[in-house]
Amino acid sequence: MDFSKENTQIRYLNSLLVPETGSTSIPDDTLDRHCLKTETTTENLVAALGGSGLIVLFPNSPSGLLGAHYTKTPQGSLIFDKAITTSQDLKKAYNYARLVSRIVQVRSSTLPAGVYALNGTFNGVTYIGSLSEIKDLDYNSLLSATANINDKVGNVLVGDGVAVLSLPAGSDLPYVRLGDEVPSSAGVARCSPSDRPRHYNANNKQVQVGTTDTKTNGFNIDATTPTEVTVDMQIAQIAAGKTLTVTVKLMGLTGAKVASRSETVSGNGGTFHFSTTAVFGETEITQPVVGVQVLAKTNGDPIVVDSYVGVTVHGGNMPGTLRPVTIIAYESVATGSVLTLSGISNYELIPNPELAKNIQTSYGKLNPAEMTYTKVVLSHRDELGLRSIWSIPQYRDMMSYFREVSDRSSPLKIAGAFGWGDLLSGIRKWVFPVVDTLLPAARPLTDLASGWIKNKYPEAASGRPLAASGRPMAASGTFSKRIPLASSDEIDYQSVLALTIPGTHPKLVPPTEREPNSTPDGHKITGAKTKDNTGGDVTVVKPLDWLFKLPCLRPQAADLPISLLQTLAYKQPLGRNSRIVHFTDGALFPVVAFGDNHSTSELYIAVRGDHRDLMSPDVRDSYALTGDDHKVWGATHHTYYVEGAPKKPLKFNVKTRTDLTILPVADVFWRADGSADVDVVWNDMPAVAGQSSSIALALASSLPFVPKAAYTGCLSGTNVQPVQFGNLKARAAHKIGLPLVGMTQDGGEDTRICTLDDAADHAFDSMESTVTRPESVGHQAAFQGWFYCGAADEETIEELEDFLDSIELHSKPTVEQPQTEEAMELLMELARKDPQMSKILVILGWVEGAGLIDALYNWAQLDDGGVRMRNMLRNLPHEGSKSQRRKHGPAPESRESTRMEVLRREAAAKRKKAQRISEDAMDNGFEFATIDWVLENGSRGPNPAQAKYYKATGLDPEPGLTEFLPEPTHAPENKAAKLAATIYGSPNQAPAPPEFVEEVAAVLMENNGRGPNQAQMRELRLKALTMKSGSGAAATFKPRNRRPAQEYQPRPPITSRAGRFLNISTTLS
C-alpha cells in the first residue's frame, strides 16, 4: 500500500471508467517492475457499397491487436477490410504487457461528395464468449446475442457514435508475452504470445476421399496468435504411384481462408498411418480465425480413410483477447462515408533489454482497499449502471457520475439521483471503515442491489433506471404524491423539512417569500422557486425562523441502532431458547441490528406489563422512559453515540399510561378473538433504541388485540415522521407474512400512514373481528410533537392556519367592568408592596397591550410546566438584532434610541469585519487595503483586478475596480527613461514610475553618464521590486538627498586639487 500520501481518488477505477485520464498501476499483488504507457488508435473505416459493415473488437486484449473491420456486400457476404491495432507495434520495444484500461469510440462526422445528410445507425453488443460462438451476425439479430441490457445498445445514430469500455472480468491479470523477437543464430525467432493455449480435439469416422477436395473434418476455433494444427489419419490401401494430398485451412469470419498448409504422401500399395503438423506463424494470421478445415484428395481411384481422422489444434490464445468480444454492426450508411475509430489503451509494459537501459521502471504498489473497492464496484456494475458499451453522448453525460464513483470522499449527489447512492455508500463504508464510528457497514450489498434497486427503479430498454413516470430519476425531496414537483436548485430538501400544499397560502411562508413565483407551466409557487412544472398553484412550507425556536420542532426522526461493546453483533441463530406465550394485546415492529460486516432485521412485539422473565439476561435491566415517565423494558437506557458524539439517553415521544415490555419474536399465531400466541426467543441481540417503535408502543398501550401488521415510524404528537432502513425492516415483517405499515425515507413500507389515527384505522381493518374502537386511541398517546407529513391534506392545512392564527398579534375585545377595575387596583396595591408582583403586573400589561392573551393562553394549555417556553426564551435573540428585524420588521418610531443602538452595533460589526479583512490583505502584501479602503470596497478585500493593478503600477487601486488591462509601454525618449524601463520590467508591463526614473537619472549623473555598476544595479532592481510589490521592504532604504533629474551635461575639467574637493562637496550637498 502506498503510505506516502492520503488520496481519496481510486485511481485504478478512475482509469477504468475514464481511460482518457491516463494509465496507472493496478494495485494488486503483481509487483513486477514496469513502466506506464498510453497508446492511441486511429482508423478511418470507409463504408463500402451498400453502407453496411461489421466492427469486431477485443476490449480486454493486452496486446496491440484491438479488432478488425469487415464490409458487407449488397448480397450480404462479409469481406475483410483491415485489422485494428495500436499506433505503435508494442512487441518491437516491449516483451510483456498488461492492459489497465481501454476505450474505443466509433462515429461518423463526414459526408461523401453529393450526400447532404448523415445517415446510418449502429447496433452494438458485448458477448461474454468468443467470436465463433455467435451464430447470427445480421444487423437486426445481433442484439439477441445477450439478454443483459447493460451490454448492448441499439439504433444509435452514426453521428452520435458508440463507445466500448474495457471492464475486466477478473483481478488476477498476468503479464503476457507480446511475441517479441528472441536471439537466434539464423533468421527471425519469436516467443509465442499464446501464453495460455487452447486445445481442440475432433475425430471423424470412416471417410471416402475422391479426386476432388473432400472435407474430412471441420470445426470452430478462435485464434489471433500463432497456431499449430496436427492431423492424424489411418489410410487404406493406395496404389503405388498414386498420391494423397492433405490440406489444412484456417478460416476467417468471412468464410474465406486465412492461411493454409498442404502435404502430399505417395502410395505404397498397403495400409499405413499418416500424421502431419501445420504451423501457422504470426505473419500469416492477418485476421481473426474462427474455424479450421482439413481437406483431402487423391489423383487416382477413391480411397477410404479407415478408423478415424483426428485433428488437434494447439495455441491461438492470449488471456483477455478472445473473450469477451464486442461486435458493432452499422447499416444504411452512405457509400464512401468515413467512420472514425479512435481508441485509448493504457498499459503496464516491461521493456526489452535494449529499452530497459534508457527507461525507468518502478514496482507496482499494493493497495488492498483500493483493489477491493474496485472489485466490489465492478461486481455490482449492473446495479450501478456501469455499461460495457455506450452511446457517446450518454457516456459523456455520465462523466460526473464516474468521478463520484471513483472518489470515495465525494458526495453521492448524482448517484443518489439515480437511486444508486445507498449501494455506493454501503460499499464505501464496508471497504473504507471510518475509525471513529462504533460499528462497520450496515447494509448487505447483494440483497440491496438485487432487490431494492430493481424493484424500485425498473429498467428501460436502454438500461437506464427510470422513475414511475418514465423520466430519469432526479434528486427530489419529500413532496405530496399528488403534485408532480421535482427538485429545485434553490432549496436543499435533503436537509430542510418541507411540505408542498396545493393552492396559495401566503400566511404559511415567511414575509419575505410571500410573493408567488412563476413556474414553466404558467402556475404559481409560493415559498420557493422551481425550474420544473408543478401542474397547479402550490405552496412550499418550510420551518419558519420563529418555529425553529420551538423545542417541539425536532429534526427528522431516524433509527439510531445502538450496540454496547459487549453485545456488538447478532451471533446466535434465531429460535434459540424460544417459548410460546399467549398475549391478549400488543403491537409488532421491526428493528435493525448492526454487527461485524453484516446487519440483520428482526421483529419485536410491545406488550403491556413487566415480562422480563422472557427476556435475555443481558438486557433485563435495560429500559427507556416514555413521555409520562413509564418504563419500556428491553429498550436501552444507556447514553448512545451518533458519529462519535454522545447523545442523551433515549426517551420515547409517546405516553403509554403503563409500563411496557418489548420482546423478540420468531413467529405469531392469531386466535379468533384477536389475541395471539407469540414465539418469543432469546436471540442475544442488544437492547432496542430509536424512535421507530413509538407507533407500536402507542398502539400496544391502547388496543385490546394484536394487529396483523408490523408498524414503524416516529410519532411527533399524533403525526408520523419517516424513519430509515425501510427495506430491511420490511424483510423482517415479510418473513412471517405481515405487511410493513408506517413511513420510511426509502419507501420500503407496504402501506404509508401519516397520523396515529391512520395506524389505528389500519389495525382495526387488519382484524376480522367485532372489536369496537375506543375513543382514546390516537389522543392520549400524544406527547410534545409537531407534524411532519409527506402528503399534505386539507386537515393539515387547517391545522397550520389555525395555529398561525392563534399567534397573530390580536386578541378578543375585553369588556370594562367595575370588578375588573377593583381587581386591578388591588393588584397595583400589592405590586407596591411586593417587587415580584410588580414584575407580574408589568408582564400582564405588556401581554394585554400586545394582544397576546389568547395566544399565550393556548400555549399554556400545551406547555405543561413551561418547559417549552423556558427553552424558547433561552434561545431568544437579543432585541434589535438582524434576525429580529428580518422576522418582525423595523422597530417602532418611538424607539429611536434602540434603532440608533442597532445601527451603531451594525457599523461596529462591519468595521470589525473590515479590520480582519484588512489585516489579511496586508499580510499578503497589499499595503493599500486599509480599513477605510475595505469599507469603501463593499467590505471586501482586493479582487484579482485590484491586485493586478497594484502589482503592475505600484499605485493604490480605486475601490470597486473590477477590470484592469495594462497599457503597453512606449520607448522612452531619453537615456534615463530607457534604462529605467529596462530595469523596472518587461515592455508589456506598466511603465516605470517617475520616482524610479529620477533614481536612475541620479545614478547616471553620479557615474558621469555611464550605466550603473553591479552594486548600483542590484540596488536599483531591489527598489524596482519594492515599488512593484508594494511591500514594507521599502522602509529598509534610507532616502538619499539627490538633486532633481536633468539632462546630462559634462562637467568642465578641474585641475587643482582644492577644486576637486570643492566639486565633490558641492555634489554631496
Swiss-Prot record:
Site (Cleavage): A417, F418, A460, A461, A467, A468, A474, A475, A486, S487, A557, A558, A791, A792
Binding, a divalent metal cation: D28
GO MF term list: metal ion binding; serine-type peptidase activity; structural molecule activity
Keyword Hydrolase tagged: yes
Location of region: Disordered: 504-534, 876-900, 1031-1069
PROSITE patterns per UniProt: BIRNAVIRUS_VP4_PRO
Function field: Capsid protein VP2 self assembles to form an icosahedral capsid with a T=13 symmetry, about 70 nm in diameter, and consisting of 260 VP2 trimers. The capsid encapsulates the genomic dsRNA. VP2 is also involved in attachment and entry into the host cell.
Organism: Blotched snakehead virus (BSNV)
Domain annotation Peptidase S50: ranges: 558-791
Active site, per annotation: S692, K729
Modification comment: Specific enzymatic cleavages yield mature proteins. The capsid assembly seems to be regulated by polyprotein processing. The protease VP4 cleaves itself off the polyprotein, thus releasing pre-VP2 and VP3 within the infected cell. During capsid assembly, the C-terminus of pre-VP2 is further processed by VP4, giving rise to VP2, the external capsid protein and three small peptides that all stay closely associated with the capsid.
GO terms classed as biological process: proteolysis
Lineage: Viruses, Riboviria, Orthornavirae, Birnaviridae, Blosnavirus
Biased composition (Basic and acidic residues): 512-534
UniProt-listed Enzyme Commission number(s): 3.4.21.-
Pfam families, alphabetized: Birna_VP2, Birna_VP3, Birna_VP4
Effect of S692A: Complete loss of polyprotein processing
Key words, A-Z: Capsid protein, Host cytoplasm, Hydrolase, Metal-binding, Protease, Serine protease, T=13 icosahedral capsid protein, Virion
GO cellular component: host cell cytoplasm; T=13 icosahedral viral capsid
Protein name per UniProt: Structural polyprotein
